[in-house]
């Protein structure tokens, strides 16, 4: 595209002209000769019917921040409102899917307070830290953005379907994959470069050693972005990856100000750091979406299509309903129930 100036000129180039450029291998030339735009036009029609926006590097609203990364996406499909990322303090929040309740609460509260201070939150829409980060931003009445590893309408992780709907109405769902494109173990690591590429910095809340969230960190480092980490107990395996990042030079944080002070002089019109220096505290209860995640069977993965099941208490007796409500997602002593 850089050689031809734009995508249109690339697509209209004849096979002979393309061969003379020396840009493509023999295999790529064979694919180019057999290429048609019929599938592309079909995707455009489908996006129009679904109400998705299509953004390419030729568009003025394609983030310059994203265009500067190695291998930027050639296209973004968007459901919702796509902001001017270059004029916003966008912060990525990542972490393990099988996180602790403490990790969920920290992610939720940190995202809420970052949003209240003027930042926008970007994550991956997955279970665990991702979902809690999105929920925190939504609770603050702000915008949040989920970068998916599949087509926007693909039935991925149905347990988070309602959360994705809320995100599309208060932010946007973003993907480089066209409608109906399935999720796989390959698509998620690839999309992580977009999560970090849209943002000024990436926050790791909880990460075991080998966590997929560390792939996002690798991309962020390659892109020259900041890395922030919530420190954890040195004996806690859920923080093994996190603490290793701190050892290697990442910024340990305990308040939203630890993050936002890095950008306040560049975005004073966006940020309000009043109260941001207070430590992260949490006392709010998990949402129903988060409770649903907790009771999800272990065999369900992000690629599964298990329908969301909510507990109906209307058929229970008053005593049974009271007993049910006394239980918690964490351990409960029998003496606390009676």
Segments and roles (model prediction):
Residues 1-60:
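Short, small/acidic-rich helices and loops at N termini and domain boundaries
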Residues 42, 56-338:
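Glycine-biased, small-residue-rich flexible motifs in mid-sequence functional cores and linkers
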């Amino acid at each position: 595209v850089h050689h031809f100036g734009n995508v249109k000129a690339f697509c209209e180039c004849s096979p002979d002209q393309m061969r003379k450029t020396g840009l493509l291998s023999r295999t790529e030339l064979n694919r180019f000769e057999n290429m048609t735009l019929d599938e592309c036009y079909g995707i455009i029609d489908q996006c129009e019917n679904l109400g998705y926006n299509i953004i390419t590097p030729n568009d003025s609203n394609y983030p310059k921040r994203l265009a500067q990364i190695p291998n930027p996406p050639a296209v973004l499909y968007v459901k919702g409102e796509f902001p001017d990322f270059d004029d916003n303090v966008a912060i990525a929040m990542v972490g393990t899917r099988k996180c602790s309740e403490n990790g969920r609460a920290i992610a939720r509260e940190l995202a809420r307070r970052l949003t209240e201070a003027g930042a926008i939150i970007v994550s991956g829409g997955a279970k665990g830290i991702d979902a809690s980060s999105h929920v925190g931003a939504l609770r603050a009445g702000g915008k949040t953005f989920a970068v998916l590893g599949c087509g926007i309408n693909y039935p991925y992780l149905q347990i988070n379907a309602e959360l994705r709907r809320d995100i599309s109405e208060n932010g946007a769902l973003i993907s480089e994959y066209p409608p109906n494109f399935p999720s796989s173990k390959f698509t998620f690591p690839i999309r992580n470069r977009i999560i970090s590429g849209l943002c000024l910095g990436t926050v790791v809340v909880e990460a075991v050693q080998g966590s997929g969230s560390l792939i996002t960190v690798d991309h962020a480092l390659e892109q020259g972005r900041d890395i922030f980490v919530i420190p954890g107990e040195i004996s806690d395996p859920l923080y093994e990856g996190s603490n290793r990042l701190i050892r290697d030079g990442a910024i340990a944080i305990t308040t939203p100000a630890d993050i936002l002070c890095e950008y306040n002089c560049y975005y004073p019109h966006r940020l309000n750091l009043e109260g941001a220096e207070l430590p992260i505290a949490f006392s709010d209860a998990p949402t129903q979406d988060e409770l649903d995640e907790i009771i999800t069977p272990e065999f369900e993965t992000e690629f599964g299509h298990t329908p969301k099941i909510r507990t109906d208490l209307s058929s229970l007796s008053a005593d049974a309903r009271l007993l049910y409500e006394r239980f918690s997602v964490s351990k409960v002593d029998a003496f606390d129930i009676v």
